[in-house]
Amino acid sequence: MAEFEYPQGFELIAGVDEVGRGPLVGAVVTAAVILDPNNPIDGLTDSKKLSEKKREKLAEEIKQKALAWALGRAEPEEIDALNILQATMLAMQRAIKNLKIQPHFVLIDGNRIPQLAIPAQAVVKGDSLVAEISAASIIAKVSRDHEMEVLDKQYPQYEFAKHKGYPTKVHLAKLAEFGVLPQHRRSFSPVRKLLENE
């Protein structure tokens, strides 16, 4: 992992990341993780760079070894009511609030920080630079992928397990063929256009 200079003077530092800003379906899922410096985890990196099998294995290890971890989410209705950016910020606030130990400082992937009562810093490419953010990205990704597998069993014709709700050619074709589900984000352009043309 490239060198990242941690903020000085803070004992408990949480990393926060989100997954699922781009999909047309389901919640945006965020995670917050406080790692244990005495219980290191090998192989932490951006969840997108890991195989599904490796992500699953690491997610279990993170949950066992971390001092604290939590998920936060914003549902499709909230995404539609707020917009995806604001809904992501809300989900991040929820993940931090759900931690059983409150951190002294929060490092957040990307370039925006939600409103928090704790000092925080945004880190561009944080999921590759900061172990805590990598851990959060892995837990969030595994959690959301599992949700898509559940949705896939409910609606097999949409093939959610394959595309995870992202606007792939397959998903757009299935959407046009079978229509909009309650779990679809109505404010997202392909879904909105379909609803307008009904």
UniProtKB/Swiss-Prot annotation:
The lineage of its organism: Bacteria, Pseudomonadati, Pseudomonadota, Gammaproteobacteria, Pasteurellales. It is found in: Cytoplasm. Endonuclease that specifically degrades the RNA of RNA-DNA hybrids. This is Ribonuclease HII. One of its GO terms (molecular function) is RNA binding. Keywords: Cytoplasm, Endonuclease, Hydrolase, Manganese, Metal-binding, Nuclease. Coiled coil: none annotated. It is an enzyme of class 3 (hydrolase). Gene3D superfamilies: Ribonuclease H-like superfamily/Ribonuclease H (3.30.420.10). Manganese or magnesium. Binds 1 divalent metal ion per monomer in the absence of substrate. May bind a second metal ion after substrate binding. A divalent metal cation binds at D17, E18, D109. Pfam families: RNase_HII. It catalyses: Endonucleolytic cleavage to 5'-phosphomonoester. InterPro entries: RNase_HII, RNase_HII/HIII, RNase_HII/HIII_dom, RNaseH-like_sf, RNaseH_sf. Belongs to the RNase HII family. Residues 11-198 form the RNase H type-2 domain. GO terms for biological process: DNA replication, removal of RNA primer; mismatch repair.
